[in-house]
């Protein structure tokens, strides 16, 4: 019989339900349990593809081309396995499917309602995921109007599948009031009471806090939540999220869950390896989304997993207003640059200035997706003298469209879910840095998310094959179009059309980030 851990949130959003869910799943996997994870997002978007990264964080792309919430990135990195579109459910998907069924006459003339039609659709999708143990994370907080139908659905599911097969874990937050030097548990108490009114009684309360809670506060949470004291778990802030699985292991979380759900655990050596000492290199992530690190989460974590301190986001718009000397003064403080993907013209000219600086000053630089396209634009402008060179994304009338909309994209009018997405085959050419990155492998699959491509057909003079003469961009990888470019006689000037950051895992960061570290160490 399938077992379920339902993770809900209270008091605040963004307090770590995703990290807790991923850590719990990894812990159970280490003890031989066949585990899977489902993230439920109560928003009405069909997927995360058109959402603003400043508001929602990065869009994570799966192997099968699904544009997902960033929590799926946590699941992949922690579990060391790929997620698919089945690992994410949104309210938009559920409503859309129910309306489609109604139009098809699937409800036989019944009045279509939240209960039972939406709740049945939700339960069917939850049941469809195969696993011995399914961890279901419900986004948002208890009390959000968008999430009520999902809480009702899991309440019904518990009744249908048996209470003995369910564990409800409520992740909440206890603030520390500095004016009185005490923790305040009242918001957590009220959050649990609200969950109970919906018909769900938590079996476990995970208390997030800035500092470790004192014993009286923990006892108070247990008393007013009606949860046994040993099922109230405090998770204070940590230096990095990769400590959390070890913390939960030391608390015996896996044993508590196995006991409650009657799951058999196998002995484990807990093979969990992440960097604990860091090289003192400074990497500038030249981007425009400054509100939160979540906008570039997978890049930041990929760098961190190589044993380098997390990159600093440098405002590309700030660089736009600077001359070359001012740009140099800012970027000289860093050992390497990363130009990430993105959309729209805001901040683009600042990124191009950063690329010019890196090219002229032999500073290691990695361009990702848009970053690679901007490398082509910078080279066309400043080496070939095509001063008006641009992408048709930013200037549809440019006389030098060195980056252009892919041919198959020109017939597409909708934005959502229509880009070139997911894992695509990439051919790597020998005698290039990228060939060294992959250890001599000539064919790989990498994840993509783009509509535009380097316009090699119209501007072949910008590019050359490995080993050819002339100061041009070396095409180091191709599919039906250019997948990567680099420069000879430069420590590391590499641009890739794909997103390597999506494939990094704990203990196995993507090789391009590992190679960048080796360049900084002087070993390449």
From Swiss-Prot:
**Residues of the Glutamine amidotransferase type-1 domain:** 282-524
PROSITE patterns in alphabetical order: GATASE_TYPE_1
What residues bind L-glutamine, as annotated? Answer: 342, 370-373, 393, 451
Could you tell me which cysteines form disulfide bridges? none
**Belongs to which family?**
Belongs to the CTP synthase family.
Q: What does this protein do?
A: Catalyzes the ATP-dependent amination of UTP to CTP with either L-glutamine or ammonia as the source of nitrogen. Regulates intracellular CTP levels through interactions with the four ribonucleotide triphosphates.
The name this protein carries in UniProt is CTP synthase
What organism is this sequence from? Thermotoga maritima (strain ATCC 43589 / DSM 3109 / JCM 10099 / NBRC 100826 / MSB8)
Q: What is the lineage of its organism?
A: Bacteria, Thermotogati, Thermotogota, Thermotogae, Thermotogales
